[in-house]
């Protein structure tokens, strides 16, 4: 697994042993020239990630980006790889892509404190400040679902269910009135918590597979009131800037205009944006 890098304090921590400049040059040549792909051909995702770490530590952020992407392609999704890829994008000044990958890291592991800290750090640098468009209860629900990974919520549900079975056994087999009362009411509460944990576990799993959120990538993007380029000032909805997070609520393929997404921003404001100007998380 690639080691985690941090840019919270604008200074990266040490990573894996740095490859020699000659090795990095060979890797770069293999990536840039199809005829010379032997340096990276057949490498495992872990090896590619280690080479990416070395490139990052050598301040070769473009090569690090390419290697992290290849590591993801070969080895599959990883919260650490997305996190480190986000760092590589940040070092190139690509805040939009950095935010996308920090968000992806948190989708896979909501407990990734470094990714959360870096996401907050980069969000503080973008033009449009993030505004929660949901209600207080929506925020509480999202915070609860995102507290742990779906598997962790499933384990919590199993533990609670085991406690419920213990309370049920105490209620059935105990002859003491006080024990029966305590086990009945305690078991009822634990059963309700078990159901809640199961629901949250499914919601957390669905969140990982969901792609309803996206990030604006260009320095600025003019949103429209309809799924086409604004043809007059009245068709211009509002302007969003790189790094802004939007919620996709609809999509349409407009002949001659390409794919467009209807998005929700801020306090419930809706508008249409070109699909090519956002990247789904």
Set out the residue ranges of the language-model regions.
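Boundary regions of SH3-family modules and the immediately adjacent low-complexity/disordered segments
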Residues: 95, 181-222, 226-235, 247-249, ...
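Membrane-embedded alpha-helical segments of integral membrane proteins
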Residues: 133-174
């Amino acid at each position: 697994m690639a080691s985690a890098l941090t840019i919270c304090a604008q200074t990266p921590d040490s990573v894996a042993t740095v490859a020699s400049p000659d090795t990095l040059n060979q890797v770069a040549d293999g990536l840039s020239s199809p005829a010379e792909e032997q340096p990276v051909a057949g490498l495992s995702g872990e090896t590619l990630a280690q080479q990416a770490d070395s490139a990052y530590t050598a301040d070769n952020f473009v090569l690090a980006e390419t290697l992290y992407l290849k590591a993801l392609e070969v080895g599959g999704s990883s919260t650490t790889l997305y996190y480190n890829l986000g760092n590589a994008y940040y070092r190139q000044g690509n805040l939009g892509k950095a935010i996308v990958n920090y968000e992806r890291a948190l989708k896979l592991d909501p407990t990734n404190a470094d990714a959360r800290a870096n996401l907050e750090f980069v969000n503080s640098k973008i033009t449009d400040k993030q505004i929660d468009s949901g209600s207080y209860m929506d925020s509480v629900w999202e915070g609860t679902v995102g507290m742990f990974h779906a598997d962790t919520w499933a384990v919590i549900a199993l533990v609670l269910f085991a406690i419920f079975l213990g309370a049920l056994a105490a209620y059935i087999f105990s002859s003491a009135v006080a024990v029966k009362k305590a086990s009945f009411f305690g078991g009822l509460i634990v059963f309700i918590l078990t159901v809640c944990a199961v629901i949250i576990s499914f919601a957390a799993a669905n969140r990982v597979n969901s792609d309803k959120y996206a990030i604006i990538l260009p320095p600025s993007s003019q949103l429209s009131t309809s799924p086409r380029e604004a043809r007059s000032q009245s068709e211009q909805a509002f302007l969003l800037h790189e790094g802004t997070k939007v919620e996709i609520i609809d999509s349409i393929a407009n002949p001659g205009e390409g794919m467009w997404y209807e998005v929700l921003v801020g306090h419930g404001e809706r508008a249409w944006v070109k699909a090519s100007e956002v990247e789904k998380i």
